[in-house]
Amino acid sequence: MSQQFQASSGTGSASLREFKTEHEDLREDLPYSTLRTLFGITLDKDASQALNIALLLYGHNYPQQVVPPERNYAELDAQLESVVLEDHTAESTMEPGVSATVTEQLEEKSDKSSDGDGTSKRLTRSLKSVENETEEDHEEKEDEAPQSSRRESTRLKRKLLESQKTVQTTGNSSRASSKSQEKEVPGTKSQCAPKIRTTPEQSKAATKRQSSTTVRASSTCGSSVSSTSTVSSPDYTAKKGRATETPKLEELAPKKQSSATPKPGGEVCVWDGVQIGDLSAQMNAQIGDDEELDTVDIARRILSELKERCIPQTALAEKILARSQGTLSDLLRMPKPWSVMKNGRATFQRMSNWLGLDPDVRRALCFLPKEDVARITGLDEPTPAKRKKTVKVIRLTFTETQLKSLQKSFQQNHRPTREMRQKLSATLELDFSTVGNFFMNSRRRLRIDQQISRSSRSTGNGADTEDELDEEDVVVENVIADATDASNQPGPSHL
């Protein structure tokens, strides 16, 4: 590469442009040390020439601080300006025929090039460099040039645009052929695509093409992007850029749901390949009055059926028998004889009818929805009894005056007459039943206190006197009389 540079360095800016066109594959961010190594340039002698080539290759944005500090910056700047001016004058004096030949050469190169992406990228970059140079030259001299030069510039621009379009079409065709050969998955893009400077018209056309391709890609691949499957991974195929998935095991498994709504009128319900019709007559059959069922044998058969067929006990209890799981467990664990049983006969009768069905039908009934089983078997679900709303009784509290008056009356007479109680209720503004309850409760508390004191004295003295026994008999008689009187007129209890 150093020999190429030495051969081209003495021929002027035209050879430098050719060198630039041939070596466009160099990166734009190469440091000065890499340039020096590539071109075989020593640090002391040819630093200015390397900087000139860097400016011609990569534009005026190349950092100038990489120049060795022992060089004179003023001399380098003057040399660079002279080289750049020569380059611009050569470009401005280029005739339309020369630019046409350049475009023809580019087209010939694109036709002869292979289908790979590297050739199309180099052609695009070379076309970009020519376009940039012509646009910068015409922008600087647009105000000073005559009308004829402006027309020539517009012609050059049109030719450049046409040549760029042809290069893009060839590049797209080459990319498509390379992708078809490599069998890549659709939707992947090249990460090292070149940055091309385009006009507003070209950018609009590119956005339209991109939107159309994205719509096509979404329409073709939309069906493949479905819910994720935990059973198998998607198996992609390269035919026409479509992705397919292997079927899930859940889709291949039989559907364990009723395909039709079962009704007693004769419609059939299918569950796991088992057809179930109307079973109300078989499930509601009753035995004669003289017959009896062996409850122990029925319980044993039910337990073995649940274990062998893997049927939950809750499903049998709630869907077939309309009972709770706890009730069924008690009946199966301790079955009573048929002659002794009163309330559980209907449950054992239904269990016996269920055991008389086909084994597959028996199991299917336990896995159908509860409403469907009720329709098929004609089961009426028991309705719970409505509880009566109990009114909460507000507890009465005596005032201090009322309590003192009642206690004083009780000390005077433990059993006041009816007229006396009516007078107290009117005086204290209390109900008649409330006054009667107070005297009854007071007598009960007095009796309890007497029993406690008597028991304490008996433990101390060892025996009860006859007077105490007579007094206890009187208290018992009084309590019985008070109870009969209170039963006629009940009321809330008070302390």
Swiss-Prot record:
Pfam families in alphabetical order:
CUT (PF02376), Homeodomain (PF00046)
- Location relative to the cell: Nucleus
Q: Which GO terms describe its molecular function?
A: DNA-binding transcription factor activity, RNA polymerase II-specific; RNA polymerase II cis-regulatory region sequence-specific DNA binding
- What's the superkingdom here? Eukaryota
Which stretches does the entry tag as region Disordered? 1-24, 89-267, 450-473
- Composition bias, kind Acidic residues: at what positions? 132-145, 464-473
User: Which GO BP terms apply?
Assistant: regulation of transcription by RNA polymerase II
What are the protein's UniProt keywords?
A: DNA-binding, Homeobox, Nucleus, Transcription, Transcription regulation
Q: List the disulfide bonds.
A: none
Q: A cellular component term (GO) from this record?
A: nucleus
Chief location of this protein?
A: nucleus
List the SMART domains: CUT, HOX
Any idea which residues the entry calls the DNA-binding region? 284-370, 389-449
Q: Which residues form a coiled coil?
A: none
Ranges of Polar residues compositional bias? 1-14, 163-179, 199-217
Residue stretches of biased makeup (Basic and acidic residues):
106-120, 149-162, 242-254
Q: Which SUPFAM superfamilies match?
A: Homeodomain-like (SSF46689), lambda repressor-like DNA-binding domains (SSF47413)
In which residue ranges is the amino acid composition biased (Low complexity)?
A: 218-233
Q: Which family does it belong to?
A: Belongs to the CUT homeobox family.
Function per UniProt: Probable DNA-binding regulatory protein involved in cell-fate specification.
Q: What is this protein called?
A: Homeobox protein ceh-21
Q: What is the organism of origin for this protein?
A: Caenorhabditis elegans
- Organism lineage: Eukaryota, Metazoa, Ecdysozoa, Nematoda, Chromadorea
Point out the gene that encodes the protein: ceh-21
